Every structure is written in C-alpha cells, then in structure tokens.
C-alpha cells in the first residue's frame, strides 16, 4: 500500500456522519485538514463540523463519486458500506483502508472463518442457513448457545440467547429473516477490548487494554487501564489477525475472558470504537487522532501515553435530563454530546470521561450519581 502524505488544507472525505465521523472530523480539523462528509441524514452529528456535507444514501454511486472527486483521501466511520461499492471506489480514489477488512468483517460468518484461519482463539461456532440446521447446532454445541445474524446488528441487535428447547422459537424467528451463525455460550468473567492503529510502513500503535461492561447489550462503561493481566496476550492475538487482514487506521478487537481466565476473540470493529472514546482526554493521542494520522500518511506515535486512569460512561437518551441537572456541579466530568436530532431512551446521545487516580472510588461515585441506570 502506497500512502499519499496529505498536506495542511487537503480534504478528507468521510463516509458516515454519525458521532464517529464527527469525532474524526474534529481531529482532522485541528491538524489543518478540511472535511467533507456523506450521510443520508441531513441532521447527522458530523454536519455541524464538516466543511461540506453531501446528503445522500450510502449506495448512491453518483454521490460517492462526488465525494471521491472532492477528497484527497476517503475514510469511513462504520462497516456496513457495501464491499462491492468500496471495491469500485478504491479503483478510482485514495482509500488507504482498502476494502478487504470490510469485505471480511461485515459478515459474521466470514469474520469467524477469518479468525479461525488466523489461528485466533475463538469459541466454537456453526453456520445456520435454515431452521433445520438448529438440530446440528444443538447436537454439536449443546445448550446454551447464541444465534446471531450474519449481516447487520449492533448494540446487541440481531442476536438471541437460546438457553433450552423452550427458548428456541426466538432463534427460529431470526433465522427466518436471514442466515445466521451459532456460537457456543461462554461463561464470561470480563469483557475487554484493544484499540490499535496501523499506519504507513506498517507502523503499529497500541492503546491500553480497555475493560468494558455492557448493559442490555449496549456498552455501559469502560475502565482504562483494564483490571486484567491479559494485555500482552491480547496484543499477540491482534498480531495474528493483522497477518491475515489488511488494516490501515484505527480498529478495535473485542475479547471475552472466561471464569478460568482464558482469553477469546469475540469480534473486530474495523474503525474507531465506542470503548476507545476515553482516549480523547486520558491519552496523549486519541483513537481519532491516530486514525487521521494513519489515513493521511503521517507517522504514528510509537507509544500511547495514559495521562491518567479513566472511567468512561455512555450517555443514553434517558440519562440526559439527569446529566443536565447535575453537570454544573461536576467539572471533572468531560462530557461529549453528539448532537443527534432525536432523543430516544436507549440511544447513545453522548459519553463522559472522568480522569482519576482511584478508579474504584470514581466508578462507585459515578454509579451512585446515575443510580437506577440499567
């Protein structure tokens, strides 16, 4: 991969105008780059910060071509862009990330097969094309198991836990919609993730291991550094993956740690990730900074310095009234509100990060402030 080193004033095109696109744009602008964004929602968060905004569907070939013509480099904030369209774009325009990661990882089955080929430690899985395949799953994996759709799904959507024969109907309903993947259920002690940036000359920069807690399948909070001894093992797993998949820019690998302290790769997000948002305040470079450095052909920092341990919490729609009531009395809360036009109870509307020398006490105090949060 040949990198074009961008200069001040050059333009970065971003496919996707959500909060990740917005935070990419903010990092790009402080480095002197211009930003043009494409998103079908005319009120998406990135519109408020982009120099230019194209309101168009992600599969609008003419609009994507316009984005390419106006940009010196193109990046993307999410993995659900059509791989076929991305292939065509890479033939005409400068897209250092390429299409392979998207092509492999937007399908849960090819993602699992890729991890298997890389030698990653993953839980046993089986493909499900139709309802009758559940018999094979029950015989080989046994109860309980998780059924996930091959395509789409985020924040727990598109997946069901099958505990026994009585709970299998929900899985059948999911399979009737599209092909799925079944995974053996894992008794999880801890969830962690590792955010990584790859740049020119195969430079690689690791962020600290992140400890995550999900509630109702949505990331609730992240603690950094993770209270785990698995950081080096997680890096080793990432190194296996990058030998198999082409990455440029920031991506995140999510892991499970079971109750016997075994580490398993869960999934890969080929772009900046929710669990890395703490890095904006807690590190000398954020995950968005390093992403922009990578796609614009600049050198990456050799190491990421944690300025202070941190607790990051997602802010959902139902949290905002409470936040507004208490925010004035908590200057230690670094609050980011994304600017989404519609507030929904379970929708990510922002996040906040607290820097601390006592993670345990800060975590308890934060939970007390948002008591009753599920």
UniProtKB/Swiss-Prot annotation:
ATP-grasp domain ranges (all copies): 112-296
Quaternary structure and interacting proteins, as annotated: Homodimer.
Reaction(s) this enzyme catalyzes, per UniProt: 5-amino-1-(5-phospho-beta-D-ribosyl)imidazole + hydrogencarbonate + ATP = 5-carboxyamino-1-(5-phospho-D-ribosyl)imidazole + ADP + phosphate + 2 H(+)
Binding-site positions, ATP: 108, 148, 153-159, 183-186, 191, 214, 266-267
Enzyme class, UniProt record, top EC level: ligase
Pathway the protein acts in: Purine metabolism; IMP biosynthesis via de novo pathway; 5-amino-1-(5-phospho-D-ribosyl)imidazole-4-carboxylate from 5-amino-1-(5-phospho-D-ribosyl)imidazole (N5-CAIR route): step 1/2
Molecular functions (GO terms): 5-(carboxyamino)imidazole ribonucleotide synthase activity; ATP binding; metal ion binding; phosphoribosylaminoimidazole carboxylase activity
Family, similarity comment: Belongs to the PurK/PurT family.
Role this protein plays: Catalyzes the ATP-dependent conversion of 5-aminoimidazole ribonucleotide (AIR) and HCO(3)(-) to N5-carboxyaminoimidazole ribonucleotide (N5-CAIR).
Coiled-coil parts of chain: none
Gene: purK
Gene Ontology CC annotations of this record: cytosol
Natural source organism: Staphylococcus haemolyticus (strain JCSC1435)
Protein name: N5-carboxyaminoimidazole ribonucleotide synthase
Superkingdom to which the source organism belongs: Bacteria
Pfam family, one: ATP-grasp
Record-linked Gene3D superfamilies: 3.40.50.20, ATP-grasp fold, A domain (3.30.1490.20), ATP-grasp fold, B domain (3.30.470.20)
Listed EC numbers: 6.3.4.18
Record's keyword annotation contains Ligase: yes
Keywords: ATP-binding, Ligase, Nucleotide-binding, Purine biosynthesis
GO biological process per UniProt: 'de novo' IMP biosynthetic process
Keyword field contains ATP-binding: yes
């Amino acid at each position: 991969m040949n990198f074009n080193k961008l200069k001040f004033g050059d333009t970065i095109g971003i496919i996707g105008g959500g909060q990740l696109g917005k935070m990419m744009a903010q990092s790009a602008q402080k480095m002197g780059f211009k930003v043009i964004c494409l998103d079908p929602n005319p009120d998406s968060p990135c519109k408020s910060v982009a120099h230019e905004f194209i309101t168009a569907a992600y599969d609008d070939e003419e609009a994507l071509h316009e984005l390419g013509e106006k940009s010196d480099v193109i990046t993307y904030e999410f993995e659900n862009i059509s791989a076929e369209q991305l292939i065509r774009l890479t033939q005409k325009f400068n897209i250092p990330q390429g299409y392979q990661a998207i092509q492999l990882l937007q399908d849960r089955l090819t993602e699992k097969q890729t991890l298997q080929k890389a030698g990653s430690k993953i839980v046993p899985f089986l493909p499900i094309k139709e309802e009758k395949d559940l018999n094979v799953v029950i015989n080989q994996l046994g109860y309980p198991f998780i059924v996930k759709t091959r395509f789409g799904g985020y924040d727990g959507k598109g997946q069901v836990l099958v505990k026994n024969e009585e709970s299998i109907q929900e899985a059948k309903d999911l399979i009737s919609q599209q092909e799925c993947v079944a995974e053996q259920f894992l008794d999880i002690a801890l969830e962690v993730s590792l955010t990584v940036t790859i740049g020119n000359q195969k430079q690689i920069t690791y962020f600290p291991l992140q400890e995550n807690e999900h509630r109702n399948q949505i990331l609730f909070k992240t603690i950094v550094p993770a209270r785990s001894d698995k950081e080096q093992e997680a890096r080793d797993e990432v190194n296996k993956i990058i030998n198999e998949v082409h990455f440029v820019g920031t991506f995140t690998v999510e892991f499970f740690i079971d109750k016997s302290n075994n580490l398993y790769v869960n999934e890969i997000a080929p772009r900046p990730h929710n669990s890395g948002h703490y890095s904006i305040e807690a590190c000398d470079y954020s995950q968005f900074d390093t992403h922009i450095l990578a796609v614009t052909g600049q050198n990456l920092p050799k190491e990421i310095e944690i300025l202070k341990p941190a607790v990051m919490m997602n802010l959902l729609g139902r949290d905002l009234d409470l936040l507004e009531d208490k925010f004035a009395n908590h200057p230690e809360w670094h609050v980011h509100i994304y600017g989404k036009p519609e507030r929904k109870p379970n929708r990510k509307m922002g996040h906040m990060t607290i820097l601390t020398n006592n993670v345990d006490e800060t975590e308890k105090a934060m939970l007390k402030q948002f008591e009753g949060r599920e």
